[in-house]
């Protein structure tokens, strides 16, 4: 009787291990491949596209145009660093002090959860994982972040991030965003335009770059101040990010 009970458990355990091994190979291969090859689509793009189709929105297209860092205004890279992760050149994927502050804040304010994800973590999540706040996803995100930080340069992480970040409904990547909102290539974005795009990143579906709210304008101004305090374009050159 005991053997019959153990057999299904053994089967499930082996199945789970095989699934995890397959995912590890898949994600490891993706990290290696995308260290040199442009990313054609991300997990978030696929999720949005499938959700739209299932909801009957057959006209929805998750649009993205890959561009190299040489074809992106240095203001854009600086803007997302100023807005999302000012210690990006220094850390190995995780900003521990920011995580500790976020945890302390969330304990006091359960209704207003604050995140502390770095650009590296956001890149790992957007590229390979699904939306959500489960501990399983967070654990996978941590492992993928370590893999990306080990294999990719900081410049590569920033390049991929800027090409797969969501800037609006169906708008992925800075080139698509620049063309949609400013009718120009990403290489010609000004400081203020880059800051405006970075200002909607916390929630690009709720916040609109083409119809900015008072909050978005306030955040844009704050990002511009932070960009100047970081040292402007020299920050990107100094940290070999452009």
Curated annotation (Swiss-Prot):
Keywords: Cell inner membrane, Cell membrane, Cell shape, Cell wall biogenesis/degradation, Glycosyltransferase, Membrane, Peptidoglycan synthesis, Transferase, Transmembrane, Transmembrane helix. InterPro entries: Glyco_trans_51, Lysozyme-like_dom_sf, PBP_transglycosylase, Pep_trsgly. GO terms for cellular component: peptidoglycan-based cell wall; plasma membrane. GO terms for molecular function: pentosyltransferase activity; peptidoglycan glycosyltransferase activity. GO terms for biological process: cell wall organization; peptidoglycan biosynthetic process; regulation of cell shape. The keyword Transmembrane applies. Coiled coil: none annotated. The keyword Transferase applies. It is found in: Cell inner membrane. Pathway: Cell wall biogenesis; peptidoglycan biosynthesis. It catalyses: [GlcNAc-(1->4)-Mur2Ac(oyl-L-Ala-gamma-D-Glu-L-Lys-D-Ala-D-Ala)](n)-di-trans,octa-cis-undecaprenyl diphosphate + beta-D-GlcNAc-(1->4)-Mur2Ac(oyl-L-Ala-gamma-D-Glu-L-Lys-D-Ala-D-Ala)-di-trans,octa-cis-undecaprenyl diphosphate = [GlcNAc-(1->4)-Mur2Ac(oyl-L-Ala-gamma-D-Glu-L-Lys-D-Ala-D-Ala)](n+1)-di-trans,octa-cis-undecaprenyl diphosphate + di-trans,octa-cis-undecaprenyl diphosphate + H(+). It holds the Pfam family Transgly. It is a single-pass membrane protein. Its EC number is 2.4.99.28. The chain crosses the membrane at residues 19-39. It comes from the Bacteria. Peptidoglycan polymerase that catalyzes glycan chain elongation from lipid-linked precursors. PANTHER family: BIOSYNTHETIC PEPTIDOGLYCAN TRANSGLYCOSYLASE (PTHR30400:SF0), MONOFUNCTIONAL BIOSYNTHETIC PEPTIDOGLYCAN TRANSGLYCOSYLASE (PTHR30400). Belongs to the glycosyltransferase 51 family. This is Biosynthetic peptidoglycan transglycosylase. It comes from Salmonella typhimurium (strain LT2 / SGSC1412 / ATCC 700720).
